[in-house]
Each structure stands twice: as structure tokens, then as C-alpha cells.
Amino acid sequence: MGTYVERLWQPEDAGGLSRKDRAPGRYLAYIPEPLERQLPQLGADALSAAEDALVVLARADEIVGSRSGFLNHLLIRSESISSSWIEGNRVTPKKLAIAETLRQGSQAALDVVANVRATEQAIAGLSDRAHAITVGDLCELQHVIEPRLKTGLRVEQNWVGGTGWSPLRADFVPPPEDLVPSLMENLAEFVTETAGNPVVRAAIAHAQFETIHPFIDGNGRTGRALIHTVLRRADAVRHTLIPISTVFAGNVNAYISGLNAYRAELSMLDEWIIAFAQATEKAAANAVELAQRVAELDITLLSEFIASRKEAGVVPSRPRKGAVTVKILETLAAEPVLTAESVCARFEVSPAAAHRALTELTDAGVLSRTKDPRGKLLCWTADRYLDLVALTERSNRVGGGDTQGQKVRGGPPAPERK
């Protein structure tokens, strides 16, 4: 699938490096072969796995259907939390949602907000098949994730993993910087022009991107966002986001092994395609399960709200259609964090009406108040919807199923920036 080139490691600025990392030496950088316009020939098992995954994607897309507008809010955040988890960045759904709504929070939370924006851009901005994907598009996608870095492809050698800060001890060394532009042009053309099974195309595009590792940072999150671009452009899914990172985060070692198999030799490509297809199926199942849980929670919260009004002697106990409380309930899955100001703007009501509705929903146990360390009210949160995001993104890390009360598997340590 590629070749190696020998390079010399001789750091110009060795300040702060350990003695081992300061030591010069030679290392091998991997150069992947450019992608062909036609998909490679696969074995029967890989073809079958990809076809099965495509059927499952279509079924999940159909099941979620008209609810995708609300569900995608939760699915994108589940995907972004898990994609960041793989890179060692841990944020709870509630902290993410609050940071996104208030535009403030820890740097970790703001980083995941950036991941959310990149995933949204990968779907909305790059899914039009009439638009030819360019290297500039991919650079912009990465810049949304890592706005603190200069936009553009890397102009120096980078590496992945290892026990120190040196390519001599790295787990994997991507191609030299001077080859990155042509390899990325080739990848952009592949994403735009190649036909065939979308699952196979997404698997190859993602693995090739991760192999090129075209940026100094943000490669993993950008590469996983690219998966959604490929699937959406190919109409493999039209409505639903498939949270594939929730599966990758469940077994990071298997995910990395799959990428290594892709790089090893052509005969091992099938191994990666099968693993990717299986991850896609499991992610589709996660999306369907979330849809079912949200539908159940919608009914539960409305019932609890009606019961609360009845107990308080409010007549009628069922709020009228069009009431602010009903409008809030109908959109909570898509807007699980609220402020009085956001309710005023969203539903065009007065501050007094917004406060009354939020207070009534809080008294019924539908919403919770969130305060800062000094006791100042920050916002209202629909914690049970946010808990569903946690269940979705955690389920694979504890082996699937209902994860409430279970301990998650440890993720990777936060990576050093190279």
C-alpha cells in the first residue's frame, strides 16, 4: 500500500527535550500510494460487510426520518464528545451544552464545541455533490477544530504516538511534508469523483487522511468529520448523523489496529473495511436507540408536567397548545440548555413569560437550574436529554447496552502536541 523513506532527525531547538529526544538519528516515514479513481477489488467478506452496513444505514435513516432535526443535535454532540475522547479530551454532555449556549467554559469544553461546528460543517457545507471538494475545504474544516493554529497544511514532519517527543520513538511517522499537498489533492479528488459503495469510500478516505496526517494537530477529529461528508454526499444517509466515533472510542486499540492494517499491505485492506463496516452498523444502531429513547422521554416529560400541574391545582392540567411551556417541551431535545433570553428570542415572548414557563417546568422536574460557584443562575438544563447523549457515547466504552451506573473503560491519555 505504500513505501518508506529514510529521514534524519536532528532537532534545531532541543530546549526542553529529554536526552533521548535530543539524540539525532534516522527514522522511516511512510508514504501511502495515491488513491485510484476506482475502488480496489475486495474479498467476498469485505464486500458483504460493506453491503450489509449500507442496508443498515438506510434503515436507520428511514427510522429516524422526520425526527432527525431534533435528534441530530444530540447525535452530533455525542459524536463530537467521542471523537474528542479518542484524542484524550474528556467533557460531559452537560458541560459541552452549557459552553455551547453561554459561549464560555473550560478550554476542553470549548474544544469540543469546535468539534461540533466542524461536524456540522462537514455535513452541511461539504455534502453537496455539485461542489468539488478541495484541499482548501479540508484545511478550513481543520481550522474550525483548531482555530488557534495557522490555517493550512503542515510544513514540517509530524508523528503519532510513542514514548517521547521524537520520530525515532514514534508509533507511526506520516509522509514528509513536501509530499502532503499532492497526496491531499489526490484525496480530495477521490472524495469528489470516486463511485461505488459509500461505506468502502468512507473507510478508505478516512484511513488515507489519517495516514497522510496533513496537519500539525486536529487530524483525528478532522478525519472522522470527513467520514460524514463522504456518507452524506453519497446519499448513504440523508437525514441522520451516524455517531461512528462512539464506536471507535469504545475500543481505541482496535480502531488504531484497523488503520495500521490499511497501511500494511493491500491484502489487509479487507480487514479495515470489515472493521469499519461493523463500526458503521453499530453506530447506526446507536442512532436508532437514541431516537427511541428520545421519543419515550418526550412522552414521559409531558406526562410528568401534566401531573405536576394537576397536583398544583392548575386548570386545565394539560397546557393549551401553543403555550410557551409546550413549545419548550417540543424543542428540548434540540435545545437542552435554555436561558430566559434564549426563550424570549426563540418564541417571541416577554421576559416575564419566559421566566414563568422556565419556573413551571423546573418545579415539575423537567428542567434543572445550573448556577456558577458563586450561586449566580447561569441557565436551565434538560438533564435527562443530556443523559441520553452520555448513554449513547458511553455505551460502547462499557460494552454496549444500558450503561447507567456502569463504569466506563479508560480512554487514552491526553496527547502531546507535535
Segments from the language model and where they lie:
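FIC/Doc superfamily catalytic core
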Residues: M1-K418
